[in-house]
């Protein structure tokens, strides 16, 4: 689980969050629109929409923005977004998974391929790296939800597989298929989660040096800056010394 904390800390480093936040609301709105379009526009009847709204609220997205994104799904002239997954390789033989919501597959594929190439990586075929990741559910809580023992006990009772706690919060992992059931059980014991989502968790991490880590960060930053890209996952890890430099 150490790789999860490391990746999160590197991606959430100082100076990066302002750049990410400027695009965050539009990405969250797109997920809400897609979720509302895929089912009923009522979050009580649409699990995906309920989670999308919950995650948007966790990022302090205004209610007006959320309502507008839901209404957009009902519009006759609203865009149709496709869910696309790209898989590729970064510096040092690292694996990268990119999830996107796009209204133009050709544009997004071209942009993603270009970003990989410029960073010294390569876009692969679907399935080329995802076999080395597990698609799991992740439920996060702030530290205020309780101490590590309380959260661990609640997670076990809810049917979760693992819990990781650090200075930022609690990260509960469960089977992807059980995400709705586990999150509902946790809500009964710990209250509403900060985020509930499906993630790609690397089975094994690939150690890289500082130079390759810097290149990987630039690659991932460029991917995240693309309007169509929703999530990026990788399997690299660095030493504690390098982590301290990268997170500064």
Curated annotation (Swiss-Prot):
In Gene Ontology terms, what is one molecular function of this protein? DNA binding
Indicate the principal place this protein occupies in or around the cell: cytoplasm
Q: Which UniProt keywords apply?
A: Cytoplasm, DNA-binding, Transcription, Transcription regulation
Cited SUPFAM superfamilies: YebC-like
- InterPro entries named in the record: Integrase-like_N (IPR017856), TACO1_YebC-like_2nd/3rd_dom (IPR048300), TACO1_YebC_N (IPR049083), Transcrip_reg_TACO1-like (IPR002876), Transcrip_reg_TACO1-like_dom3 (IPR026564), YebC-like (IPR029072)
Cell location: Cytoplasm
Q: Name one GO biological process term.
A: regulation of DNA-templated transcription
Query: Which residue ranges run through the membrane?
Result: none
Q: Which GO terms describe its cellular component?
A: cytosol
Superkingdom is Bacteria
Pfam families tied to this protein: TACO1_YebC_N, Transcrip_reg
Matching Gene3D superfamilies: 1.10.10.200, 3.30.70.980
Q: Which family does it belong to?
A: Belongs to the TACO1 family.
Tell me the protein's name.
Probable transcriptional regulatory protein RHE_CH03475
Q: What organism is the protein native to?
A: Rhizobium etli (strain ATCC 51251 / DSM 11541 / JCM 21823 / NBRC 15573 / CFN 42)
Q: Provide the taxonomic classification.
A: Bacteria, Pseudomonadati, Pseudomonadota, Alphaproteobacteria, Hyphomicrobiales
């Amino acid at each position: 689980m150490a790789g999860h904390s490391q990746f999160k800390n590197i991606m959430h480093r100082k100076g990066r969050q302002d750049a990410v936040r400027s695009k965050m609301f539009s990405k969250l709105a797109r997920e809400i629109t897609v979720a509302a379009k895929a089912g009923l526009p009522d979050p009580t009847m649409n699990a995906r929409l309920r989670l999308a709204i919950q995650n948007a609220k966790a990022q302090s997205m205004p209610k007006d923005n959320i309502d507008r994104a839901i209404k957009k799904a009902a519009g006759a002239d609203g865009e149709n977004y496709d869910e696309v997954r790209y898989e590729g390789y970064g510096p040092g033989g690292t694996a990268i998974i990119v999830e996107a919501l796009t209204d133009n597959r050709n544009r997004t594929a071209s942009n993603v391929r270009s970003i990989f190439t410029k960073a010294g990586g390569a876009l692969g075929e679907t399935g080329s790296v995802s076999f080395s990741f597990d698609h799991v559910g992740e439920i996060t809580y702030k530290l205020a939800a309780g101490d590590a023992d309380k959260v661990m006990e609640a997670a076990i009772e809810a049917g979760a597989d693992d819990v990781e706690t650090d200075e930022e919060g609690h990260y509960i992992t469960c089977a992807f298929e059980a995400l709705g059931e586990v999150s509902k059980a946790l809500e009964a014991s710990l209250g509403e989660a900060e985020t509930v989502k499906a993630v790609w968790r690397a089975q094994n991490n690939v150690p890289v040096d500082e130079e390759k880590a810097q290149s990987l960060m630039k690659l991932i930053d460029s991917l995240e800056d693309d309007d169509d890209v929703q999530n990026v996952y990788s399997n690299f890890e660095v030493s504690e010394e390098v982590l301290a430099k990268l997170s500064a």
